[in-house]
């Protein structure tokens, strides 16, 4: 039986995600390893995330082991920056792929790494879930959810072993939001960008999963 999994928006709304100021420069903000907080409401009691260091740079290391309950880390965008952030950049690398994990297949929805990007308009939360899949097809969008309070799409951003190398990503927030939630309308209003989440898991496939997450840069 597939394991029920809430949307990140639900976690973000109801959990205690602390707002911690990110390191700032003139045109961007850096969300460092120390800024992430456990999203408590739907996370298990044991966090499998640690802060590691490579070449003097701290990063988040996720090491999920079978039997653990899934844990999500979150970062809440400061109120004054929610309309100012234009792009999100990050680096990640898959270390251990969950056995046969594919977020687009019911009952196999585990990922080596996940990045959630969330906006809010009124009472409705919009989330794009970018995953590093074990076997899923890169570029595929699936598991779409739409109701009066939540809209969410899952996008397979990367798939398969990465050879232990860091991979850089950049998401244009307005473009991504309009493409997924406004049918590509270039004039559609983009609501406030309110939060980011990260997760590695293997609970559905009952297998190990591991990944590293470097600093996130929020470009104003």
Q: Can you annotate each of these PLM segments?
A:
Residues 1-11:
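Bacterial N-terminal signal peptides that target proteins for export
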Residues 9-20:
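Bacterial N-terminal signal peptides
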Residues 25-44:
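Extracellular carbohydrate-recognition regions
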Residues 50-70:
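Short carbohydrate-recognition loop motifs
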Residues 75-88, 160-163, 187-189:
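Extracellular/lumenal carbohydrate-interaction signature centered on repeated Trp-anchored short motifs
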Residues 95-165, 172, 209-212:
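Extracellular ligand-binding interfaces
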Residues 107-115, 159, 163-208:
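Extracellular beta-strand ligand-recognition surfaces/modules
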Residues 196, 215-218:
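Extracellular beta-strand elements of beta-rich domains used
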């Amino acid at each position: 039986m597939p394991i029920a999994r809430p949307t990140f928006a639900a976690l973000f709304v109801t959990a205690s995600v602390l707002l911690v100021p990110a390191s700032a420069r003139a045109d961007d903000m850096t969300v460092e390893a120390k800024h992430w907080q456990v999203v408590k409401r739907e996370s298990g009691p044991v966090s499998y995330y640690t802060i590691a260091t490579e070449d003097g740079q701290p990063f988040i290391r996720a090491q999920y082991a079978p039997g653990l309950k899934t844990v999500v880390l979150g970062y809440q965008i400061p109120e004054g920056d929610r309309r100012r952030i234009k792009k999100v950049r990050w680096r990640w690398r898959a270390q251990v792929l969950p056995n046969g994990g594919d977020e687009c297949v019911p009952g196999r929805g585990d990922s080596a790494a996940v990045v959630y990007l969330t906006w809010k308009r009124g009472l409705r939360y919009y989330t794009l879930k970018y995953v590093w899949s074990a076997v899923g097809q890169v570029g595929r969008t699936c598991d779409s959810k739409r109701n009066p309070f939540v809209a969410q799409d899952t996008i397979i951003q990367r798939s398969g072993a990465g050879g232990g190398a860091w991979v850089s990503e950049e998401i244009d927030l307005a473009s991504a939001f309009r493409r997924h939630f406004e049918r590509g309308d270039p004039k559609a209003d983009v609501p406030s960008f309110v939060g980011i989440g990260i997760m590695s898991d293997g609970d559905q496939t009952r297998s190990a999963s591991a990944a590293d997450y470097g600093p996130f840069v929020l470009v104003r």
